[in-house]
């Protein structure tokens, strides 16, 4: 495994997982709001 690839991939993966986490949390809030 090339270390440069890890250095490039790590922040991209962190950013992608953070974005998905935020989208998922917002989606859950919207669903809970619709249920009430």
Curated annotation (Swiss-Prot):
- Which residues span the membrane? 5-23
| InterPro entries referenced in this protein's UniProt entry, alphabetically | PSII_PsbY (IPR009388)
Q: Which residues lie on this side of the membrane: Stromal?
A: 24-36
Localization annotation:
Plastid, Chloroplast thylakoid membrane
Q: In its UniProt entry, what is this protein called?
A: Photosystem II reaction center protein Y
Any keyword Heme?
A: no
Q: Name one GO biological process term.
A: photosynthesis
């Amino acid at each position: 495994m090339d270390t440069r690839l890890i250095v490039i991939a790590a922040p991209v993966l962190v950013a992608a997982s953070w974005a998905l986490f935020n989208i998922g949390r917002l989606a859950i809030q919207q669903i809970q709001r619709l249920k009430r």
